[in-house]
């Protein structure tokens, strides 16, 4: 199985999350598994090159992957397609950076080997969702793309995890791209289009199963995980840890103490902002630049 990540830019937080996620899979990998990072910042993955393959892309590649409608997240589908072509005999498991393997990796490998697709949690049908997603659905409801007429049987799955069996990869990805481009051509709301395209393509061409709770997607509690990742990276750097020692450090983390979901009150956020404005830091001093 090829375990795939895609990162853009040089914001440290994204790459720290990717690092943690990669380690969570590395500890259960066998000789026929590989980790592939597709990134615009390959220099941030030099340390991981000891146990992961890094594929460098640039802004021109991303722009090409966005397609004629310049839809940024179409690049996710194209990145999966690119790696699938590099490793046509491998099942592909794409992951967002803010994911972590909690359960047994074989619970992911088995359905892929049986020809079933995988995605994160089933969110339900877009007709019952909030404003922008609902507007998207109203535009595309009943329309036909690549021989598929969109209906109430087509639920939306979170795309933080996308698993594609290798024998069906070409068909699934061609269908996902046709859905994505067709919806964009028809003027659908430019939100979660790639997510819905992958959901429908996998449902129709491979069948679809959820990966939660084998994989946790902590999109609503990132700060806790970023801090844990930074502390781990610091220990690895400061101790000059070998890959084996690094893995033991990761295994020593008590991940059960890190929340995978936190509801943050808007009122608390507004009050914190207000207090910050009323009681600003004073007498702030800096080291002077040398002339």
Spans of model-derived segments:
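A structural signal for well-ordered alpha-helical segments within the folded catalytic domains
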Residues: 16-19, 23, 74-78, 192-196, ...
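Secondary-structure boundary elements
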Residues: 27-31, 82-93, 166-171
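A short, glycine-/small-residue-rich helix N-cap motif at loop->alpha-helix starts
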Residues: 65-75
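GT-A fold catalytic core of metal-dependent nucleotide-sugar glycosyltransferases
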Residues: 77-128
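Short, flexible, basic/aromatic active-site loop/helix in glycosyltransferases
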Residues: 138-153
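Catalytic core and acceptor-binding pocket of nucleotide-sugar-dependent glycosyltransferases
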Residues: 149-240
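C-terminal catalytic/acceptor-binding lobe
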Residues: 214-291
């Amino acid at each position: 199985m090829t375990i795939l990540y895609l990162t853009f830019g040089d914001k440290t937080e994204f790459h720290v999350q990717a690092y943690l996620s990669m380690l969570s899979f590395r500890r259960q990998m066998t000789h026929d598994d590989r980790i592939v990072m597709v990134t615009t910042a390959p220099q941030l993955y030099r340390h991981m090159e000891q146990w992961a393959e890094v594929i460098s892309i640039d802004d021109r590649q991303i722009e090409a992957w966005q397609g004629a409608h310049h839809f940024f997240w179409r690049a996710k589908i194209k990145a999966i397609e690119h790696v699938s072509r590099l490793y046509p005999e491998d099942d592909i498991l794409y992951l967002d950076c803010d994911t972590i393997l909690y359960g047994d990796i074989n619970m992911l490998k088995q359905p892929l080997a049986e020809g079933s697709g995988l995605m994160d949690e089933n969110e339900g049908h877009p007709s019952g969702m909030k404003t922008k997603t609902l507007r998207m659905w109203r535009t595309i409801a009943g329309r036909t793309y690549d021989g598929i007429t969109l209906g109430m049987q087509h639920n939306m799955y979170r795309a933080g995890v996308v698993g594609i069996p290798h024998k069906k990869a070409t068909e699934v990805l061609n269908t996902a791209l046709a859905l994505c481009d067709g919806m964009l051509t028809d003027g659908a709301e430019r939100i979660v289009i790639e997510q819905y395209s992958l959901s429908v393509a996998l449902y129709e061409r491979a069948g679809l199963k959820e990966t939660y709770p084998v994989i946790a997607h902590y999109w609503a509690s990132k700060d806790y995980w970023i801090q844990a990742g930074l502390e781990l990276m610091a220990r690895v750097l400061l101790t000059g840890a070998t890959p084996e020692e690094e893995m033991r450090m990761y295994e020593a983390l008590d991940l059960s103490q890190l929340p995978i979901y936190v509801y943050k009150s808007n009122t608390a956020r507004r009050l914190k902002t207000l207090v910050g404005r009323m009681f600003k830091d004073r007498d702030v001093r800096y080291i002077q630049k040398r002339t």
